[in-house]
Amino acid sequence: VYHKNNRISTVVSATNKTLSFNKKWTVANGMVQLATAFPQAKIVWCNTHCQENLNLKSIEVLFHHNKMMLSYCPDDNSYLGSKIGYVEESPFIKVNKKVSYPTWQMSSAVGVIHAAVLLEIKDKIKTDCDFDYYLNSVAKIGMPLGLLCYSEPKLLTETTIEKSSKASVFDLFKFVKEHYRTRWLFLLLLNFVVYEFRFPVV
């Protein structure tokens, strides 16, 4: 699934056949629809900026288990940014981009997941949201349930730094509200006031 600006641009099968799709779909919705149509397939997503460097050959080796989710963000900063560290101090936050690294922080730049996983959680996550938000939600929900999520640099043959999508303050608070206990929402707000010297208007 090649995409740009939160919309699908092209869908290509493993046999290099171009597949039809609804241009009104968000990328997340399109992936769920593809998972429904091809429930045994590995679904790869790639931003058009990274298309020339997509390492499809590596996926067969790297993606050795159906309960895996691999992704890679060439940008130094993740979608949710460093401020997610206000509510979580786990090793999953500071990702080593040079090696395969366990983390729930996924990226719309490039990645792969099995259709069965998307079908399993399709009723738990809305698909009308930003694609990065959707991917991070999938991993955040999936990891405690046994989904193996990794940042994997080998998904790209060459790393080119592209500005990736970043969460707004509203999206950050929304993510914390959906995936953490309520007290962490108040802690995030407190940290914004104390360390950012501002009261976030969301």
Identify the role of each PLM range.
Residues 1-40:
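Active-site-proximal specificity loops/subdomain of glycosyltransferases
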Residues 2-12, 90, 167-202:
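C-terminal, non-catalytic tails of nucleotide-sugar-dependent glycosyltransferases
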Residues 8, 32-85:
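Conserved donor NDP-sugar-binding/catalytic core segment of glycosyltransferases
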Residues 77-80, 89-113:
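A recurrent flexible, glycine/aromatic-enriched loop bordering the glycosyltransferase active site
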Residues 84-86, 92-93, 106, 133-140:
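Non-catalytic protein-protein interaction scaffold segments in large eukaryotic complex-forming proteins
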Residues 102-109, 113, 118, 122-130:
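Conserved nucleotide-sugar donor-binding catalytic segment
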Residues 108, 127-130, 136-159, 177-188, ...:
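Catalytic donor-sugar/metal-binding loop of nucleotide-sugar-dependent glycosyltransferases
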Residues 123, 157-173:
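Mixed-charge (acidic/basic) macromolecular-recognition segments
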